[in-house]
């Protein structure tokens, strides 16, 4: 049985939107570099805030003899750093990087990024570009299938996205708890609806936000579980959620990221599941990579957030990684697989 409750829009009115990156071009047709700065927090950090930086650009042929052929868009994250440099200075330095791209494979297709030029301003982010980084290709590239192996590839930075982490605390991505399942527990999930302006280009912005197309994603927050064998009622869970005083915002961690802050009282069990943190971040890069790629340059705004209460998936259910095939007596048998939609 699934129960759904709507949050009031005041919970995301202040920082529940991200401005678009509108492309402009030089006279010869090349994109003009731009920087986008996002601050999803309340700004209560007293010292200089940390910044999370991502790059967005074009994967193209590295051919010095002819005009480069663009193959795909890419967006590798550089991670968190502390810097007093202006965003425009960081953008200029990023566009001067000579980043090599190589396609490879492991459990899934990968893209390797590494830089061949010395870094000056982006020193806090030195490790990722200089030592090289390997990413799940579908998380950082919109068309890895078009990236050739027989032609050297480079990554030309066009945009940078900077997310100021101005909260007086720590952001936590509770990865270890996202697949946690428990008997007689109620899973607390959030279903978020975004309005997206997918039209990119001059004069194509839709003024009426109500007309924008919508997309949804779901994140798992935690489980409500009693010590006894009984299960909490949906009304009790709703009361616990209301006590938490949740506030929502959109940031740019790993592309686009919902940020959740609890301003009220949280149950001890749920607080422990979240690592005793009240400021959470769920990068869409990990949750919904297809939607994340769509939002790389788009304007988006939270239209609706709902609390979804569902029974926790039984531990006996097998997930995709547990598929077993045996050929005893010449017969192939695959165990029935259930992919849980919540933890």
UniProtKB/Swiss-Prot annotation:
Homodimer. Dimerization is critical for virion formation. Interacts with host ANP32B. Belongs to the morbillivirus/respirovirus/rubulavirus M protein family. One of its GO terms (cellular component) is host cell plasma membrane. The M protein has a crucial role in virus assembly and interacts with the RNP complex as well as with the viral membrane. Associates with phosphatidylserine (PS) and phosphatidylinositol 4,5-bisphosphate (PIP2) at the plasma membrane. Interaction with PIP2 triggers matrix protein lattice polymerization. Matrix proteins induce host membrane deformation and curvature necessary for virion assembly/budding. It comes from Measles virus (strain Biken). This is Matrix protein. GO terms for molecular function: lipid binding; structural constituent of virion. It is found in: Virion; Host cell membrane. InterPro entries: Matrix_C, Matrix_N, Matrix_Paramyxo_C, Matrix_Paramyxo_N. Gene3D superfamilies: Viral matrix protein, C-terminal domain, Viral matrix protein, N-terminal domain. One of its GO terms (biological process) is virion assembly. It comes from the Viruses. Keywords: Host cell membrane, Host membrane, Host-virus interaction, Lipid-binding, Membrane, Viral envelope protein, Viral matrix protein, Virion. It holds the Pfam family Matrix_Paramyxo_C. The keyword Membrane applies.
